């Protein structure tokens, strides 16, 4: 029996507060140590379950075939765990930039899995959902669990973490960076010494992708050079988005008001418990 109600689900963005590349495996995947924290900037998926057996999505992302959309792929994978006639109509409000390092596609996929698990009344555990999610992307599980975490391995080994919930200014450079291209780069840092969690939390945080991205993407370098005059600034993920850290949202807003015309930017609050988790808790 499905839950018939229409629900608007958040799919929050994330920041990588640090990202270290500690090696590369024989299969080409990179060994990482990174700290994920959510922010209060979200895509939204409004989902109405039905018994049509079909998944419909409005609007689909321009230039992307429906079968390649992570929302659609997540729903179709989950359908194999439920009655064949279960379907859903999904409406996407896309607020997160694509290819920005904020995890938008992975978060959308995770929200789809969590939402349909509830609305189709499948009741898989989060551990099982994460096993499904990692098939769609290495960082999908962190969005499913919805807790700030240190991720290791290729990103699938998660340990809960409790970084300060700071305020951020997030800048969106006018360029797209391919994650695959960054990780395939010959001069990418790949030999950072692996650290204990205590060492990771108690040191200055860096992103090993940043030197390569700054050198090869002048628009990102320009943003970092401008923002670092105001506050500690670094790349999130492989970019292109850049974030600066502030003690209060008011401090971040002051810098936002000084943002030059050539730069899109916004402010956000760090969250150790995701908005998706908070909504799910009210539905049980």
From Swiss-Prot:
Keyword Nucleotide-binding attached: yes
Gene Ontology BP terms: isopentenyl diphosphate biosynthetic process, methylerythritol 4-phosphate pathway; terpenoid biosynthetic process
Residues involved in ATP binding: 97-107
InterPro entries: GHMP_kinase_C_dom, GHMP_kinase_C_sf, GHMP_kinase_N_dom, IspE, Ribosomal_Su5_D2-typ_SF, Ribsml_uS5_D2-typ_fold_subgr
Domain of life: Bacteria
SUPFAM superfamilies referenced in this protein's UniProt entry, alphabetically: GHMP Kinase, C-terminal domain, Ribosomal protein S5 domain 2-like
Pathway(s) where this gene product acts: Isoprenoid biosynthesis; isopentenyl diphosphate biosynthesis via DXP pathway; isopentenyl diphosphate from 1-deoxy-D-xylulose 5-phosphate: step 3/6
Name of a matching Pfam family: GHMP_kinases_N
Active-site residues annotated for this sequence: 14, 139
The keyword Nucleotide-binding is assigned to this record: yes
This protein's UniProt keywords: ATP-binding, Isoprene biosynthesis, Kinase, Nucleotide-binding, Transferase
Catalytic reactions on record: 4-CDP-2-C-methyl-D-erythritol + ATP = 4-CDP-2-C-methyl-D-erythritol 2-phosphate + ADP + H(+)
EC number: 2.7.1.148
Gene Ontology MF terms: 4-(cytidine 5'-diphospho)-2-C-methyl-D-erythritol kinase activity; ATP binding
UniProt-listed HAMAP family: IspE
Functional note: Catalyzes the phosphorylation of the position 2 hydroxy group of 4-diphosphocytidyl-2C-methyl-D-erythritol.
Family: Belongs to the GHMP kinase family. IspE subfamily.
Protein name: 4-diphosphocytidyl-2-C-methyl-D-erythritol kinase
